[in-house]
Amino acid sequence: YYLASVDTSEGSAGIPVIWGTDAVHGHNNVIGATLFPHNIALGAAGDPALTAGIAAATAREVSATGIDWIFAPTLAVAMDPRWGRTYESYGSEPDLVRQFAGGVVDAMQGEGIVATAKHFIGDGGTHQGIDQGDTRLSKEDLLSVHGQGYVSAIEAGVMTVMASFNSWNGDKIHGNQYLLTDVLRGELGFDGFVVSDWNGIGQVSGCEP
């Protein structure tokens, strides 16, 4: 893919492709890679240094397979155990998630791999724990609870942020200029690349595939 992307012999602009992978508990899509506990177990262990070491080891194994980008860490604050993706969260305490976020980003990007803070924002706080549901909070509560990990990740220089499938007070996060531009960039100071989740743009009105 990479060689084809930079080939300009037939008039292509030669823009190099970048490939990302969900290495969320080790390089879990590769047979023989080291698998680690999911985030909920790491949060329970309460050891940010251990978690950063796991992130660095994961990044090295991802790099060894020629991939430059990891879709991690997940910075959800899981507020309802009925949410089916609770295992992806470090826990239900915003301060705990914040403690882990920056170190994981530093560890991954210190190994030359692009990290992704995800899923912005409020995926762990949907009404009744419904996956891809509606997070019904004021902006202040949204940021004070579900934004703390992003503050830490951005301070650590995270290069990418992934938009979330959920809605905020009835409006889909994908395509939400206020949250993805005004808040994420204008207020939180993120200056990197925002990526959609899997076909997330297909959930935006007028953008159906």
Question: Where are the regions a protein language model picked out?
Answer:
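Glycoside hydrolase catalytic-domain context in secreted enzymes
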Residues: 1-209
